[in-house]
């Protein structure tokens, strides 16, 4: 039905005409065509009222356009954050104008809604009329009484704008007036959270997130490198004066800059926590290389246009041009950024000890703690428990990641602990998961990372995966990303030699068999010496015939870190993730940029109770959409990693797969920790620190109070595992307070840094040089060079050589013990045509150890004679067992994959870096590690004298040695002193020699010192194949009966009877194996045409 409207034509007399209903809405909207009111910010920055105090008032410069206006220094405080603002009275005027404008528009908007409702009640509008209940109260004109409270009277602002009075009293009156005005809007939470006040106070959604550090500078700036994004139509927030003169082209966009101690973040809006871009501060070059002038992170730029004011921020391989409103703001930004980048203790743009990006931690009571894990079983169980306790985010970085990996064994009852199931469960709970994996060259490696990425991405939308590098675009074909990291909530991280992939799970028993399958399902029953699977997609399908081939046991060491070192590791991950994202997915919104977290020290005016209160609000903050884990607290939300030990040290289902009847069967599990009095390091402890003297780090370490958390342990995680203490297991160490420093190998290609970092290499050399008595090394490779070696560049070998010569000249006992794999862990027999890579690596290792003028033993023999073995010796590991109940007895090397060095039982270096040029030079493979220096000492002995050993380092060595030597419970005291003859010669060397001889008698396995050429190897292989019918690629199958001659008679015996005399897994490294062969690739092998750098 049409509506009618009265019209008054010029001819006089009224007449009516009909108007269609659809015309009314447009008419109504045209009557109230005011600018829409800004919506009330749903994300509130302030949860409680901040405080602000005027600390000083300054008179304007003589050249000021308005000399009567004053500048005010305002000190603000919100919770544990303090910051200062310098505001002119004119800025107060603009703030007041903006608040009045907001109030006016809100009022108009409210009345517009009321008129619309009134018209609808008359049946004129689009919607049916609102029928009001007769009993309902009359709707007041102003339904929101808080709107009146949000208004700031103009009378409050006027004294601030122009304080009246005599010249002498203007400053006093102005200070009083400004304080009164601040009190008006600081007393109302709605006004404080308005966009106008938040901009005036220079705050945003990131300002008060404690995990990102203290509040520094924030403001609107202009950038042009970002793609176009949606912008507000409100021009009142324009930051650049030149905008009014149209000097900025369309490529420049206004963003909100947030400066934190470790980065500069760019946001679209203060109320939006989503990153548009981030500049993570990194070590700057010392000079520009031309005139020796130091390079700054931020520098002011000169522009021929006087209306443009800009500066440049350079970090890593990135350089961003930024504009500000005026020259004063540019100078303020430049000074603030450079100050933040060099602010102690981090000083991210200043290289620290060893040239590392990260500073030494634990010099004070900052919560730095570490815990070691020996072999994959212990480490994987701890990682699983940490993932299960994740609350906000998980970072995973690996050379190889297998989604189907079981982190707890036996695998059948632990399906929930499979990696993909663990991650899926946490992703469904809202935990954000970021996985960074190495993109291999498919022709060289068979790890199939594209399959891993596809499987991981299919878990849940909260799982993000990046593979890097893209080889063609980056030009990187020879080098890899080799780090192995798991970081949970920035609270605990795991670092070391273990990838989350097949073949790595193992225990101290190092079983060679598993038939029927109980512990190692499908392709996890892994022996790369025998065969590398062509595909990993059918993970539960066996690659090896279990009745014929042993698995290759895997020995590794991993470490958990808490406190500032954990966040330093996370910072490395963030740096690598952001660099990969910019190169591979710059415009993909589903792959976000990440922000590094910061160790924030509680200010002096706040106590431990305040810290606890902040921590209790973590859950509330996560609901608001910003992860505010209390990472500045020295108390982690995660408790100690559980000490996990299988209930049964023998076969878990009664099968005999991998059964050992040897000395290690009598161990009753790993050794028990020796109970010793623990003493913190104080200023009087005669401990030569493993630090550079110029850094002044030999400072007393603050003693930890009674609230130390060494005794806190997680509850049982699963019925098949029990929680123990450090006195009950030898595969998990005590959680220990210590000094820590994160070290790494990175360069431009791997992390986008402006210069090469080789701090792992520097740390190795420094530790060796400062060692007093003893160095213990376990590593996958041992390839290094002496001074003058132009081919192998790293100088770990040179440092060892010099230290040994010094000990010899000083006539002091000094021991270096090196444990490495017996053979490279690559496919192919020693004589196979396709095993040139195996032989090439053997060449470089023997070149380092014993062959040629560049080897350490050759040089030591030439200098000190046969006593060289008193100073340095080399070893490997080997295991044996039955492949099945009625199967043959087999042996395999225990593949040493750990990357550790322990010095004087007081310092330990653990990480992913091998001892070769690939890992140590920084410009090749990317690596990460941690140097741990003990601050908690225990009574021990060294060279026959009392010695204060470190709790972390000594317990790790004792665990490793008790496993390698097969020591029973109660025998640990025999190896307390690692350098005495009774330990080094009578136990360590004697055990290795005896075990090696027994393995030779039973198996004649390779490598050994009796086979000097490929021809001799062919003859031995042919003999054993003819005698046994089948053997392994390294002659690892024993005959059913051993034959020996006694008084002319042949005596036959069970090989297991002979093998019972073996203790542990330690064997001598065969120095004479293949000594008559040149093991380098030859012209008809493809490896001949590859760069030798690939192998060393």
UniProtKB/Swiss-Prot annotation:
* GO MF term list: phospholipase D activity
Q: Which reaction does it catalyse?
A: a 1,2-diacyl-sn-glycero-3-phosphocholine + H2O = a 1,2-diacyl-sn-glycero-3-phosphate + choline + H(+)
Q: Which Pfam families match?
A: PLDc (PF00614), PLDc_2 (PF13091)
Per the database record, which ranges form the PLD phosphodiesterase domain?
Answer: 477-504, 892-919
pH dependence of this protein's activity: Optimum pH is 7.0.
**Activity regulation behaviour:** Calcium-independent and PIP2-dependent.
Protein's UniProt keywords contain Acetylation: yes
The record's subcellular location field reads: Cytoplasmic vesicle
Protein name, as recorded? Phospholipase D zeta 1
Q: Gene encoding it? A: PLDZETA1
């Amino acid at each position: 039905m049409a509506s009618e409207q009265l019209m008054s034509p010029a001819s006089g007399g009224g007449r009516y005409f009909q108007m269609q209903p659809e015309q009314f809405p447009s008419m109504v909207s045209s009557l109230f065509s005011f600018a829409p009111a800004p919506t009330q910010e749903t994300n509130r920055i302030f949860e409680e009222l901040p405080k602000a105090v005027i600390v000083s008032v300054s008179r304007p410069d003589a050249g000021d356009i308005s000399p009567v206006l004053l500048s005010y220094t305002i000190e603000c405080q919100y919770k544990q954050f303090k910051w200062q603002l310098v505001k002119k009275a004119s800025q107060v005027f603009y703030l007041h104008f903006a608040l009045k404008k907001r109030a006016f528009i809100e009022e108009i908007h409210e009345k517009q809604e009321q008129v619309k409702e009134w018209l609808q009640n008359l049946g004129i509008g689009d919607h049916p009329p609102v029928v009001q209940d007769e009993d309902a109260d009359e709707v007041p004109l102003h339904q929101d009484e808080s709107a009146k409270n949000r208004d700031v009277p103009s009378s409050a602002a006027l004294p601030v704008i122009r304080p009246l009075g005599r010249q002498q009293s203007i400053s006093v009156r102005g200070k009083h007036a400004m304080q009164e005005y601040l009190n008006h809007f600081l007393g109302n939470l709605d006004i404080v959270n308005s966009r106008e006040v938040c901009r005036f106070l220079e705050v945003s959604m990131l300002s008060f997130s404690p995990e990102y550090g203290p509040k520094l500078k924030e403001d609107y700036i202009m950038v042009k490198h970002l793609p176009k994004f949606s912008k507000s139509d409100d021009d009142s927030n324009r930051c650049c004066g030149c905008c009014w003169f149209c000097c900025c082209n369309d490529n420049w966009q206004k963003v909100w800059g947030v400066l934190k101690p470790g980065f500069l973040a760019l946001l679209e809006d203060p109320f939006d926590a989503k990153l548009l871009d981030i500049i993570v501060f990194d070590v700057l070059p010392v000079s520009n290389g031309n005139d020796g002038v130091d390079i700054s992170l931020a520098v002011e730029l000169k522009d021929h246009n006087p209306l443009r004011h800009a500066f440049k921020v350079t970090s890593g391989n990135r350089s961003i041009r930024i504009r500000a409103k005026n020259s004063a703001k540019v100078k303020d930004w430049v000074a603030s950024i450079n100050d933040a980048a060099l602010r102690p203790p981090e000083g991210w743009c200043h290289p620290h000890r060893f040239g590392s990006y990260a500073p030494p931690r634990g010099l004070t009571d900052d919560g730095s703690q570490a815990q070691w894990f020996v072999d994959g079983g212990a480490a994987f169980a701890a990682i699983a428990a940490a993932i299960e306790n994740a609350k906000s985010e998980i970072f995973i970085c690996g050379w190889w990641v297998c989604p189907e990996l079981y982190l707890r064994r036996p695998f059948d009852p632990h399906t929930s602990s499979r990696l993909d199931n663990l991650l899926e469960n946490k992703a469904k709970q809202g935990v954000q998961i970021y996985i960074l994996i190495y993109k291999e060259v498919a022709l060289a490696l068979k790890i199939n990372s594209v399959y891993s990425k596809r499987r991981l991405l299919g878990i849940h939308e909260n799982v993000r995966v990046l593979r890097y590098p893209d080889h063609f675009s980056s030009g990187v074909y020879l080098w890899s990303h080799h780090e192995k990291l798991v970081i949970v909530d920035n609270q605990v991280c795991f670092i070391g030699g273990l990838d989350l992939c097949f073949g790595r799970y193992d225990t101290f028993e190092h079983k060679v068999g598993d038939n029927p399958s109980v512990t190692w399902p499908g392709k996890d029953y892994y022996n790369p010496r025998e065969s590398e699977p062509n595909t990993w997609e059918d993970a539960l399908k066996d690659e090896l015939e279990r009745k014929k081939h042993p698995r290759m046991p895997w020995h590794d060491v991993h470490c958990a870190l808490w406190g500032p070192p954990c966040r330093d590791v996370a910072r490395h991950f963030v740096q690598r993730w952001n660099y990969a994202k910019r190169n591979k997915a710059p415009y993909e919104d589903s792959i976000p940029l990440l922000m590094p977290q910061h160790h924030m020290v509680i200010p002096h005016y706040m106590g431990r109770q305040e810290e606890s209160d902040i921590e209790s609000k973590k859950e509330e903050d996560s609901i608001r959409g910003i992860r505010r884990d209390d990472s500045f607290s020295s108390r982690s939300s995660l408790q100690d990693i559980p000490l996990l030990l299988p209930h049964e040290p023998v076969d878990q289902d009664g099968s005999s797969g991998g059964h050992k009847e040897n000395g290690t069967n009598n161990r009753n599990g790993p050794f028990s920790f020796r109970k010793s009095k623990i003493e913190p390091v104080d200023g009087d402890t005669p401990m030569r620190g493993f630090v550079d003297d110029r850094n002044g780090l030999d400072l007393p370490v603050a003693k930890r109070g009674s609230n130390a958390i060494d005794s806190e342990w997680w509850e049982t995680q699963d019925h098949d595992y029990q929680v123990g203490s450090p006195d009950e297991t030898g595969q998990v160490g005590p959680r220990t307070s210590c000094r820590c420093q994160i070290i790494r190998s990175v360069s431009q290609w791997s992390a986008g840094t402006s210069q090469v970092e080789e701090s792992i290499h520097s740390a190795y050399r420094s530790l060796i040089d400062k060692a007093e008595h003893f160095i213990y090394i376990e590593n996958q490779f041992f390839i290094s060079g002496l001074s003058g070696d132009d081919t192998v560049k790293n100088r770990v070998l040179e440092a060892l050589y010099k230290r040994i010569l010094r000990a010899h000249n000083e006539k002091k006992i000094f021991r270096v013990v090196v444990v490495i794999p017996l053979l490279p862990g690559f496919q192919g027999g020693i004589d196979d045509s396709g095993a040139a890579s195996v032989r090439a690596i053997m060449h470089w290792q023997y070149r380092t150890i014993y062959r040629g003028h560049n080897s350490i033993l050759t040089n030591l023999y030439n200098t000190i004679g046969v006593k060289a073995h008193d100073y340095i010796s080399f070893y490997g590991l080997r295991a044996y067992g039955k492949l099945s109940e009625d199967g043959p007895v087999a042996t395999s090397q225990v593949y040493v994959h750990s990357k550790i060095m322990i010095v004087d039982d007081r310092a330990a270096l653990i990480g992913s870096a091998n001892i070769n040029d690939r890992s140590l030079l920084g410009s090749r493979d990317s690596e990460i590690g941690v140097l741990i220096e003990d601050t908690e000492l225990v009574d021990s002995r060294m060279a026959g004298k009392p010695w204060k050993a470190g709790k972390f380092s000594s317990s790790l060595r004792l665990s490793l040695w008790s496993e390698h030597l097969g020591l029973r419970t109660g025998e640990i005291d025999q190896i307390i002193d690692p350098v005495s003859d009774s330990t080094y010669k009578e136990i360590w060397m004697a055990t290795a020699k005896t075990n090696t001889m027994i393995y030779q008698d039973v198996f004649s396995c390779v490598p050994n010192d009796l086979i000097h050429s490929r021809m001799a190897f062919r003859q031995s292989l042919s003999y054993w194949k003819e005698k046994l019918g089948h053997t392994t690629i390294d002659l690892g199958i024993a005959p059913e009966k051993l034959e020996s001659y006694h008084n002319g008679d042949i005596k036959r015996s069970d090989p297991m009877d002979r093998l019972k005399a073996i203790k542990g897994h330690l064997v001598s490294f065969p120095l004479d194996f293949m000594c008559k062969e040149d093991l380098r690739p030859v012209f008809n092998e493809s490896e001949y045409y590859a760069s030798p750098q690939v192998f060393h």
